[in-house]
Amino acid sequence: MSKRDFLSTADLTRAEVDDLLDLASRVKGKKPGQVLHGKTLGLLFFQPSLRTRVSFEVAMVQLGGHCINLSNDDLYELEPQEQAVMDGAAEEHVKDAARTLSRYVDALGIRAAARSGDWARDRQELLLRSYARYASVPVINLETSFGHPCQALADLMTMREQLVSLRGRKLTLMWCNHPEPKSLGPTHSLLQVAALAGMDVTLAHPLGFEIDDEVLRKGRATAQDAGGALRVVNDREAAARGAEIVYARSWGAPKYWSDAEREAVVKRSLQDWRVDEALMATTQNALLMHPLPVRRNVAATDAVLDGVQSVIYEQAANRAHVQKALLMQLLK
């Protein structure tokens, strides 16, 4: 029997997303019992994690399974390229690590969101895709520089809970300032599922902070096919006006991917790109969302993060429920 991986929201149909979120809602309302008794999930984190790590551990335990966590310090430096001459720093090939771990665990989760400085390389998700290629068990994307599908599904679940029907609802996905260049993963994945749901999506960012060209192009086509829309604006106030959801997120620009110092200089003039009470006052009493962690009073102010329209903790809680549903689909 062929295995199923969970690598990208771009691989999902509308029906598959709906089925998974429907299952997540049922799981949230009623504990499913020990349906994964005897199953083991291996999690490999090459970057720090709080919500992803804990929510997957909790999900697996509540389903009766077991979870093993390995961080970057626990792992050898890996070589993802096929037929590489391994006379450099890499101690082990991904092929050997993936095939070995497949003998121990029933599924693997990989977080590999490192920034190499080469966007053309990082957008290929080489480490994640290499694990998926060589592992004989399901591989789950826990975030790369290019995608974060688990976060996006929890985001969509939260929107469904708050607004019920999503088709035509106005989502503003807004770039916010941050002292570091962050992954585009949450932005790309949310845009993909929001377009699939037929939402009216406004992507707002300063000039120079465009997302990946292919993701934007496919997102527009998906939105049109689903009865929604996707537009890009470079004015934060115009983007927020009339929004029903404001999703704040920082991301590093592919344009500056090889020059973080230059990006930092550019962002000094963009400190007004944050979500505050004045901006939220122009919306349709919009929900405020953020995937966390958040730089308070840089990306968004305390007043809006702690305000009555904020659903950031509901988002975080729904990570566990979405991931329980995902694990049940992959392993049950």
Regions found by a protein language model. Give the residues of each.
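Positively charged, low-complexity intrinsically disordered leader regions
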Residues: M1-V58
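Phosphate-coordination loops involved in phosphoryl transfer and adenosine-cofactor binding
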Residues: V35-L41, R167-R169, N285
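Phosphate/diphosphate ligand-binding glycine-rich loop within oxidoreductases
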Residues: L36-L44, L50-R160
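Glycine-rich phosphate/diphosphate-binding loop of Rossmann-like nucleotide-binding domains
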Residues: F46-H66, R160-A248
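Short, conserved loop/helix-junction motifs that constitute active-site signature segments
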Residues: L166, A195, A278-N285, G307
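Rossmann-like adenosine-cofactor binding region
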Residues: A221-A303
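Adenosine-phosphate binding glycine-rich loop
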Residues: N285-L287, P291-K332
